[in-house]
């Protein structure tokens, strides 16, 4: 109708499905390759986006508030979000929610915004995080932390890598079936190596980073391309900003003797790959 979404009364929004449609080409969501009336916003999911990305241009702004920082603040104040991505945070609405809980959530977010505007000391905003990593974040303010984490996202362009991981032409090559890869893992035909040394090697476990919470390298696929780049970028973040380690499944964070934390994964041994005659296609063999 040409009017802002929030100018309509709540009662009308609740009854009219138009308010929940993903319109193809709309700038606010950035999704592509779907048709009219194909997808709708789930009214039971309360999704907030945090500052840091220009929605119209899809580019990083000079300053941002990574959702993980807001999520940490809420957890330290007794509110557990369902999920926090790079610049979005999700809450699930259930029949158990009441007005008091919603008001508490809104009040906490508003208080966080006031602390951000005042550039309060990090020790006051996130006392648990600060206590656990006092040496790393000594004398930091909340905006200092937001800026550093935002700059890391921007340096590695994590939003673009995350999006590219699920494009068909960026998916890892499959060298063997997932079941066959699992058999090789169970039989011990594997080695645990840093992902920084895994390019071209065959994964034997499915690797799932959270965010986005989806398996990105299936057993039997080759560690390569943007999927490997994403995990290596996460590894850099683990070392730069302690306290914001993402949840990872199928790969393992280990501390090296030099103190650096690295992400490791199980891969098929080169000897076993050659025994199976795996050349991994596209004219490229098992790397030496």
Question: What does each of the following model-derived ranges do?
Answer:
Residues 1-288:
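Non-catalytic terminal extensions of PLP-dependent enzymes
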């Amino acid at each position: 109708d040409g009017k802002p979404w929030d100018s309509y009364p709540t009662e009308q929004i609740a009854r009219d499905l138009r308010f929940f449609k993903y319109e193809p080409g709309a700038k606010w969501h950035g999704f592509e390759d779907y048709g009219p009336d194909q997808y709708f916003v789930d009214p039971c999911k309360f999704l907030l986006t945090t500052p840091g990305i220009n929605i119209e241009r899809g580019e990083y702004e000079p300053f941002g508030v990574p959702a993980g920082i807001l999520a940490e603040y809420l957890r330290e104040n007794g509110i557990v979000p369902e999920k926090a991505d790079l610049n979005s945070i999700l809450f699930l609405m259930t029949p158990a929610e009441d007005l008091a809980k919603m008001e508490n959530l809104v009040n906490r977010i508003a208080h966080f915004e006031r602390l951000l505007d005042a550039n309060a000391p990090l020790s006051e905003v996130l006392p648990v995080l600060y206590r656990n990593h006092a040496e790393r974040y000594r004398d930091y303010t909340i905006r200092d932390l937001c800026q550093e984490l935002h700059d890391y996202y921007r340096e590695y362009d994590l939003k673009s890598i995350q999006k590219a991981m699920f494009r068909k032409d960026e998916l890892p090559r499959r060298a063997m079936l997932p079941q066959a890869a699992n058999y090789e893992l169970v039989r011990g035909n594997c080695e645990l190596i840093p992902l920084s040394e895994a390019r071209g090697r065959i994964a034997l476990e499915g690797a799932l980073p959270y965010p986005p919470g989806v398996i990105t390298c299936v057993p039997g696929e080759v560690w390569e391309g943007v999927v490997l780049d994403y995990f290596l970028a996460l590894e850099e973040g683990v070392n730069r900003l302690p306290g914001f380690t993402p949840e990872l499944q199928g790969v393992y964070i280990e501390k090296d003797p030099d103190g650096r934390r690295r992400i490791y994964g199980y891969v098929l041994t080169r000897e076993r790959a050659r025994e199976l005659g795996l050349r991994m296609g596209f004219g490229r063999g098992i790397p030496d």
